């Protein structure tokens, strides 16, 4: 069985995000980029399923500019067998919406015919948490979201997911779509030999037009601003002063 894993290039989680001077989006020039942490977990889970004998091939895919190839090479260095790059140069004012990404992944899934599609439950840049669900809807496949445990056999996937007050266990007929939670696994580090091998591997390149997918966006970003700075705290001299401020200023008493 083949597993298709979707990955995304984002600003590294350790970088302090800054807004562009023209307020059209987030500054990405000369900023460290990396694979979305939830996507790393998706790749790791696909590799573990292959190593357990539940899958025979792991194919990584991404949508983005030429620089996104670095993210695919990270997936290859981790152990993915092949990679597909859907080339798309982003327009800050017309972002690539989750529905457009889901349409592209649907087209790739129809080409690759995987038994399972795994992707992170969300990306840390936009936090949309929509692509996996939309992909399952477009493919008319069952879905298991926020997976914290995955067990795979030839015909079914068993997914454990954390819900309010406990753990929910669901059974999915394959093919299916699964989105990963942070608790699912701990991604491995790519070894230096595998990193070097990944640099020489050929990445298949296609465009949305090649896949016959319309990715035009109906949404326009009007303005992006940084959150307001938090006001400095005030040291109070007594409990009486605290109570007075809670009553007369905050009006919570």
Curated annotation (Swiss-Prot):
GO MF assignments: electron transfer activity
UniProt keywords, alphabetically? Electron transport, FAD, Flavoprotein, Mitochondrion, Transit peptide, Transport
Asked whether the keyword Transport is assigned, the reply is: yes
Q: How is the cofactor bound?
A: Binds 1 FAD per dimer. Binds 1 AMP per subunit.
Q: Name one GO cellular component term.
A: mitochondrial matrix
Q: Which InterPro entries match?
A: ET-Flavoprotein_bsu_CS, ETF_a/b_N, ETF_b, ETF_beta_N, Rossmann-like_a/b/a_fold
Gene Ontology biological process terms, A to Z: amino acid catabolic process; fatty acid beta-oxidation using acyl-CoA dehydrogenase
Could you tell me where this protein is found in the cell? Mitochondrion matrix
Name the SUPFAM superfamilies for this protein.
Adenine nucleotide alpha hydrolases-like
User: Could you say which cofactors this protein requires?
Assistant: FAD; AMP
Tell me which family the UniProt entry assigns to this protein.
Belongs to the ETF beta-subunit/FixA family.
Tell me the function of this protein. Answer: The electron transfer flavoprotein serves as a specific electron acceptor for several dehydrogenases, including five acyl-CoA dehydrogenases, glutaryl-CoA and sarcosine dehydrogenase. It transfers the electrons to the main mitochondrial respiratory chain via ETF-ubiquinone oxidoreductase (ETF dehydrogenase).
**Subunit structure and binding partners:** Heterodimer of an alpha and a beta subunit.
Q: What is this protein called?
A: Electron transfer flavoprotein subunit beta, mitochondrial
Organism, per UniProt? Answer: Oryza sativa subsp. indica
């Amino acid at each position: 069985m083949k597993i298709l894993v979707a990955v995304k290039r984002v600003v590294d989680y350790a970088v302090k995000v800054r807004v562009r001077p023209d307020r059209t989006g987030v500054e990405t020039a000369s900023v460290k980029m990396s694979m979305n942490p939830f996507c790393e977990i998706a790749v790791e889970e696909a590799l573990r399923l292959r190593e357990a004998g539940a899958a025979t091939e792991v194919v990584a895919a991404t949508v983005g500019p030429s620089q996104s190839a670095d993210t695919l090479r990270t997936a290859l260095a981790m152990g993915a067998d092949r990679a597909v790059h859907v080339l798309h140069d982003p327009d800050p004012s017309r972002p690539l919406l989750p529905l457009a990404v889901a349409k592209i992944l649907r087209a790739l899934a129809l080409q690759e015919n995987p038994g399972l599609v795994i992707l992170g439950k969300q990306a840390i840049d936009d936090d949309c948490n929509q692509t996996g669900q939309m992909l399952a809807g477009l493919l008319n496949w069952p879905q298991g979201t926020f997976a914290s445990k995955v067990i795979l056999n030839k015909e079914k996937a068993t997914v454990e997911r954390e819900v309010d007050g406990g753990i929910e266990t669901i059974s999915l007929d394959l093919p299916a779509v699964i989105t990963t939670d942070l608790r699912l696994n701990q991604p491995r580090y790519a070894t230096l030999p595998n990193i070097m091998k990944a640099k020489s591997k050929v990445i298949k390149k296609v465009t949305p037009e090649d896949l016959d997918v319309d990715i035009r966006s109906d949404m326009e970003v009007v303005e992006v601003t940084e959150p307001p700075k938090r006001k400095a705290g005030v040291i109070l001299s007594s409990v009486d002063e605290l109570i007075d401020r809670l009553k007369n200023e905050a009006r919570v008493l």
